[in-house]
Amino acid sequence: MCNSIILENKIFDSQWDNKNHTLFENLMPRDNNNLIENSNYDNNNINNNNNNNNTDNDNDNNNDNEPFYNSNIPNEMQINKYSRFGFKPSQPISKKNENQIEFNNILSFSIKSFLLLILYILFFNYQLYSKYFIILLSLNLIITLISIKSIFKYKNLKKLKNILIYKIQSKIIIL
């Protein structure tokens, strides 16, 4: 059994030596002098990185360890040196998305506060706290409407957050 495995390995090794490792050379050239003619690699991009103007990042130091940028490959396919797996970093959140996130946060806050008010009334006597319930419910609706309007009114979201915090604090004081 062991002899057959050794024999198979020797046969495999001899076949591998005869093929001259062409599989790996087709996938990735080992050095600059051994490039395949039909590949997308360009000798100028590898040997003359400092003189290349068709790069994604012009501020590169062009060290040997960093990936080179090939002008034949489209920008979407280029390897980004700052990412670990070759993907470009995620784009920053736009203002519309930021406003949408803030809008969703405000809506979730208003729904939660409304549910808390209902729980508050359920645990206590409804007749004693009916006036307070109506006042708190109206305050909740007013705060929600004002905060939704202020999203479209204020471009700076920090101002909006400060306004919301102030209104929440006033609501807690009333409670």
UniProtKB/Swiss-Prot annotation:
Primary localisation category:
membrane
Q: Which residues form a coiled coil?
A: none
Regions of compositional bias (Low complexity) in chain numbering: 35-56
Organism superkingdom: Eukaryota
Q: Which UniProt keywords apply?
A: Membrane, Transmembrane, Transmembrane helix
The subcellular location is: Membrane
Membrane topology label: Multi-pass membrane protein
Name listed for the protein in its UniProt record: Uncharacterized transmembrane protein DDB_G0291522
Query: Where in this protein does the record put region Disordered?
Result: 35-70
Protein species of origin:
Dictyostelium discoideum (Social amoeba)
Question: Membrane spanning segments where?
Answer: 106-126, 132-152
| Taxonomic lineage from the root | Eukaryota, Amoebozoa, Evosea, Eumycetozoa, Dictyostelia
Identify one Gene Ontology CC term for this UniProt entry: membrane
